[in-house]
Amino acid sequence: MEDTPERTPSSESIQPPGLAREPEVTSPGDSEGCARPLDPAPKKLCGYLSKFGGKGPIKGWKCRWFFYDERKCHLYYSRTAQDANPLDSIDLSSATFDCKADAEEEGTFEIKTPSRVITLKAATRQVMLYWLQQLQMKRWEFHNSPPALPATPAAALTENGPTLHLKLEQEEAELEEFLCPVKTPPGLVGTAAALQPVPAMPSALQNISLKHLGTEIQNTMYNIRGNKQAQATAHGPPVEESSQSAEPQRGEQPLISDPSIPEKEPEDPPKSAPRSCVPSGPMQKPKRQSNTFPFFSDGLARSRTAQEKVVALEQQVLMLTKELKSQKELVIILHKALEAAQQEKRASSAYLAATEDRDRLELVRHKVRQIAELNQRVEALEQDRERLVHEAGLREQQVQALQQHVQLLMDKNQAKQQVICKLSQKLTEDLAQPQPADATNGDFLSQQERLEHLKDDMEAYRTQNRFLNSEIHQVTKIWRKVAEKEKALLTKCAYLQARNCQVESKYLAGLRRLQEAAGAEPGDFPELLQQLVQEALQWEAGEASDSVGLSPVSEYDDYGFLTVPDYEVEDLKLLAKIQALEVRSHHLLALEAVERPLRDRWATLTELMPSAELKQLLRAGVPREHRPRVWRWLVHRRVQHLHSSGCYQELLARGRACEHPAARQIELDLNRTFPTNKHFTCPTSSFPDKLRRVLLAFSWQNPTIGYCQGLNRLAAIALLVLEDEESAFWCLVAIVETILPAEYYSKTLTASQVDQRVLQDLLSEKLPRLTAHLGQRHVDLSLITFNWFLVIFADSLISDILLRVWDAFLYEGTKVVFRYALAIFKYNEEAILRLQDSLEIYQYLRFFTKTICDSRKLTSIAFNDMNPFPMKQLRQLRAAHRERLEAELRELELLKAEYLERRASRGRAVPEGCVSEDEGEGDS
């Protein structure tokens, strides 16, 4: 047997197999193409490091004993390894690590937490890299570990060990560009480092922590008592007996073994320790040792066969425990369901058995009290939901901080890579230049020494670069795990709220049935029931309005439109989700860069007047809080010669007195209006009724048009922004009667057809490549663009861009519609040119407007790239195409009249053998 110190059981049993690996790599310089073997057993992460801290004259490096706690993911430190209580701890769960190649002292690295930055220094550079890699590994294991199971620690560790071992091996195979694992420095880390003498400091006072003076005093007193006990037992029984029977005195010290975890074989001693053969009798007594690190003989180690059997049995026990737990949960669920059914049956029987109204009223009051109790439970659940949402917000802030740190590390990495490239290029140039013949020997030696320094710097930067790559990769993985946990919390909130709504709806249905059954009888309880129903309805509406913000990417925007469109094609659903995320991203970026300055400018505009500044502000978009006021002013400018007080109410009165012929078509189109908007699909919403009244009033206002499909979308947009139905009515009047040309919504849609031909000419002028490409494939764009002009892009663009278009459209007129139509094609020109098949082009044109997310880019194209765009040219094109279209319509009317005249002249002759429809069945 070798005379080497044995490890304590805690150093082997705390970490599961396969988690802490000790690769056989000698130095960071051999990191390229290095092998990654694993040590047979994990080692405890502990050792002496220097910590920079203190204030005033005591500020400087202080030697501290660091040890890692896997349960909390904390790195504790104390003054010596024998101290009973740690001075402080560092939370590694949200920490990042950094090392600087150009540090003043070798082995310096940093641990950055959200609250502070801890600067540490290792004895050598290899020890520093070992600590950094091990801390990264421990942090990832903590974030990636599943929740604790109700079983013995040994069984849980044995079960999770092989799985994590395989995962880590797979990850290492994929990350060859990262820093290879560093070999364990012998005698400097692990439990063997505790046996080494404490590194000497310049003065004893410098190593004392004044910040934790109370803990220092406690540790000193404990060490004094421990030394006295060691001296008292020096003449007692042999060391091996006392070490085997002694109980650990400090359960909090992480180096003490856990008796519930089986002991493993002792690992190989450090290479630097001398080896000598000793007899198998009693062990030699060490010169000096602490009671924190007991020694065990090699005979206590169990065989691997017995260990494997124990592990297999523990795994089987854990599996049976899980199965028993699931069976118990199933029995509890079935028991609760049975109790609920029996309680409902008893309540129904009691209600039917009651002969008098008083008894039934008492039963109803009992149910009301139960509802009150349920409301209290709902409030408690709501508080829990708010707490979870708050925690999710804190997690999101933490994730943002980590992302910023990752970006900072990437910037540093890029800058250092540039430095490496410059140094390499300079080195190559220096080597390529021939040395002068008269160069002295001293110059050559200095240049050679400088070259060696540069090589060392390059190697240091290369090592730092690889470490930072691994740090960025691991922080990104941790961020993803945190995002998944946040999503799970939000899903849980939504589930609890859904269950709450189910309970409320169940009792609400019961109350409604009671109200219908007893509404005609005298008494006070019908009024009470009616009041309860109204309160429940109001509560349900309030809960529905509060549930919008549960998703990280909101399902609806500020005006109620779905941010994720409901496409029919399966592949387009993924595109829709991506588009929703892009919209959110552009919105957040615009909020910081553009929206806030724009809102400040709008806030200073107290009085609106036509001007060039107002024109530019409207093109940039009106903030949501100012949009209703601005739109009312724009509409009033358009219809002030038509507006009269009481006109809208008179039109509504006419509609109530007499049914309009278009009322049936309006009723049919109400359900087709924005089916993805929650304001028009919710059964309790008042928007459909408002829209019906606005469209009926317009039908009486303009009998020439009456009602045309498409007007419902225009009125709906006005309602969503202005919220007042009379203001929405006058907005519809302004669009149809003052902004758009006449006969835009006539039976023949003459003006709409003219605009389609004008758009084709403008496309040929502004986008000749796209026009030629579509012409070669016989693509008719009017099939797509006709609806754009008819409803001013409603249901085509996302709501944020759509309302920006309307902001400028209400002020400048139809020229804005042409500008944005051309800008949409310019925005997607390259994507359309890549499509070669006409069917693919039509499929793409059907939804490509929904893929536009960057409103600033689209606005810039519309009002900058499409210039010049004179209104005079637009009027001339409209006049020319209108003349041609009217000539074509007259020709069609002549052909129709000739056909009718020719048909009338021939008469309705019946061929022989055929029976006319005018003949009765009885005729022969």
UniProtKB/Swiss-Prot annotation:
Q: What SUPFAM superfamilies does this protein map onto?
A: PH domain-like, Ypt/Rab-GAP domain of gyp1p
Record keywords: Cytoplasm included? Answer: yes
Highest taxon of the lineage: Eukaryota
Annotated compartments: Cytoplasm; Cytoplasmic vesicle; Cell junction
Q: What are the Phosphoserine sites (modified residues) in this protein?
A: 916
| Ranges of residues in domain Rab-GAP TBC | 621-813
| Keywords on record | Cell junction, Coiled coil, Cytoplasm, Cytoplasmic vesicle, GTPase activation, Phosphoprotein
Quick one: which gene encodes this? Tbc1d2
Coiled-coil spans are 303-332, 361-418, 444-477, 871-906
Q: Where are the transmembrane segments?
A: none
Q: Where is this region: Interaction with RAC1?
A: 297-435
The record's note on quaternary structure and interaction partners says:
Interacts with activated RAC1 and CDH1.
Q: Which PROSITE patterns match?
A: PH_DOMAIN, TBC_RABGAP
Mind listing the GO molecular function terms for this protein? cadherin binding; GTPase activator activity
Q: Which Pfam families match?
A: PH, RabGAP-TBC
Any one GO BP annotation for this protein: positive regulation of GTPase activity
Instruction: Mention any one GO cellular component term assigned to this protein in its UniProt record.
Output: anchoring junction
Protein task: Acts as a GTPase-activating protein for RAB7A. Signal effector acting as a linker between RAC1 and RAB7A, leading to RAB7A inactivation and subsequent inhibition of cadherin degradation and reduced cell-cell adhesion.
The annotated regions of Basic and acidic residues compositional bias extend over 261-270
- Originating organism: Rattus norvegicus
Domain PH residue range list: 42-140
Spell out the residue ranges making up region: Disordered. Answer: 1-38, 228-296
The record's InterPro entries line, in alphabetical order, gives: PH-like_dom_sf (IPR011993), PH_domain (IPR001849), Rab-GAP-TBC_dom (IPR000195), Rab-GAP_TBC_sf (IPR035969), Rab_GAP_TBC_domain (IPR050302)
Positions of the UniProt region annotated as Interaction with CADH1: 1-167
Entry protein name: TBC1 domain family member 2A
Main location per the UniProt record: cytoplasm
